[in-house]
Swiss-Prot record:
It comes from Escherichia coli (strain K12). GO terms for cellular component: plasma membrane. Disulfide bonds: none annotated. This is Protein HemY. Gene3D superfamilies: Tetratricopeptide repeat domain (1.25.40.10). The lineage of its organism: Bacteria, Pseudomonadati, Pseudomonadota, Gammaproteobacteria, Enterobacterales. It comes from the Bacteria. Involved in a late step of protoheme IX synthesis. Pathway: Porphyrin-containing compound metabolism; protoheme biosynthesis. Its main location: membrane. It is found in: Cell inner membrane. The gene is hemY.
Length: 398
């Protein structure tokens, strides 16, 4: 606009001043090696004005041409973006249908023009993996990595997910270790870490992430408790595999008091020691647990114990009966322990006390065995009959 205004000013000046100097046009000589150009000052001014008009016209024409090209390019780019958006929407519908071949095709096609090309390539990689095409999955993943720039977390999460799908468990564990350094409370990273650590037996690492899982609300409390117990049992398995019962004892000794007072771990430790034929240590762990707090779970390994000092355990069981009252499982466990060293009369009394509180087919069978030893065949037969009737009642024929 300024240039046009200047041009009009010059033209007006020429119109006003021109007639004033019409009688005094002057003389201009432009001389070169081969040419001599002669004109008046007025003629030169007119030539310059015309040259400026021509230049402005050329500029205007070029601007229109380039503006048209830019509009054309914008139209083509917008068309590709609209197509990419439509294909992404179609791919999401195909994902809901489980048509992974179409998901990959639609997500990858025109992905560079999508609103979030990294997401398109990552979803295409997962769809290719679902089809078992690892080469295509890797290709899409690498393209996503190129476009992601510094925001590599989504790409690395997808990479770990693909590795787990391929059972490349140690590679996945390496990946989640690096991710946890960057984002230790990312819910999906924690879920993937859980899978990788379980598959590779990284039980200490699994224990380390459980507090972060609680803060990130990954899984409910019951699930996290199950994971914690699984991790501790995994560590027990490793200690037993390395050094047998001695390794188990040393490992247990090195744990914190809080850990050693967990009933579930006491039961698991006793069972591991029984499997190692270290019954005395297993019995001591059970006794220590019962003295601290009564829990039915501590009674479950007792029938498998084969110790040289069962009287100590039986004394503890009787004391528990006094402390917590008549409980059928306590009486039944005491009866089974008494049977191991021939205390048939005491065992029969214990089983009767258990059956008095609730019927149980196993207690009927054990009581019948004790009565046989006491030479009471008729009463033993009656107990077996009652046990059979209870079994049939609980498991009616189909």
């Amino acid at each position: 606009m300024l240039k046009v205004l200047l041009l009009f000013v010059l033209l007006i000046a020429g119109i006003v001043v021109g007639p004033m100097i019409a009688g005094h046009q002057g003389y201009v000589l432009i001389q070169t090696d081969n040419y001599n150009i002669e004109t008046s000052v007025t003629g030169l001014a007119i030539i310059l004005i015309l040259a400026m008009v021509v230049l402005f016209a050329i500029e205007w024409l070029l601007r229109r041409i380039f503006r048209t090209g830019a509009h054309t390019r914008g139209w083509f780019v917008g068309r590709k973006r609209r197509r990419a958006r439509k294909q992404t929407e179609q791919a999401l519908l195909k994902l809901a249908e489980g048509d992974y071949q179409q998901v990959e095709k639609l997500m990858a096609k025109n992905a560079d023009h999508a609103e979030q090309p990294v997401v398109n390539y990552l979803l295409a990689a997962e769809a290719a993996q679902q089809r078992g095409d690892e080469a295509r999955a890797n290709q899409h993943l690498e393209r996503a990595a190129e476009l992601a720039g510094n925001d590599t977390i989504p790409v690395e999460i997808t990479r770990v997910r693909l590795q787990l799908a391929r059972n490349e468990n140690h590679a996945a564990r390496h990946g989640v270790d690096k991710l946890l350094e960057v984002t230790p409370r990312h819910p999906e990273v924690l879920r993937l870490a859980e899978q990788a650590y379980i598959r590779t037996g990284a039980w200490s690492s699994l224990l380390d992430i459980i507090p972060s899982m609680a803060k990130a609300h990954v899984g409910d409390e019951e699930h996290r408790a199950m994971l914690e117990q699984q991790a501790w049992i995994g560590l027990m398995d490793q200690a037993r595999a390395d050094n047998g019962s001695e390794g188990l004892r040393n490992w247990w000794k090195n744990q914190s008091r809080k850990t050693r007072h967990q009933v579930a771990l006491q039961v698991a430790m006793a069972e591991h020691l029984i499997e190692c034929d270290d019954h005395d240590t297993a019995q001591q762990i059970i006794i220590d647990g019962l003295k601290r707090q009564y829990d039915d779970r501590l009674l479950l390994p007792i029938p498998r114990l084969k110790t040289n000092n069962p009287e100590q355990l039986e004394k503890v069981l009787r004391q528990q009966i006094k402390n917590v009252g008549d409980r059928p499982l306590l009486w039944s466990t005491l009866g089974q322990s008494l049977m191991k060293h021939g205390e048939w009369q005491e065992a029969s009394l214990a089983f009767r006390a258990a059956l008095k509180q609730r019927p149980d087919a196993y207690d009927y069978a054990w009581l019948a065995d004790a009565l046989d030893r006491l030479h009471k065949p008729e009463e033993a037969a009656a107990m077996r009959r009652d046990g059979l009737m209870l079994t049939l009642q609980n498991n009616p024929p189909q």
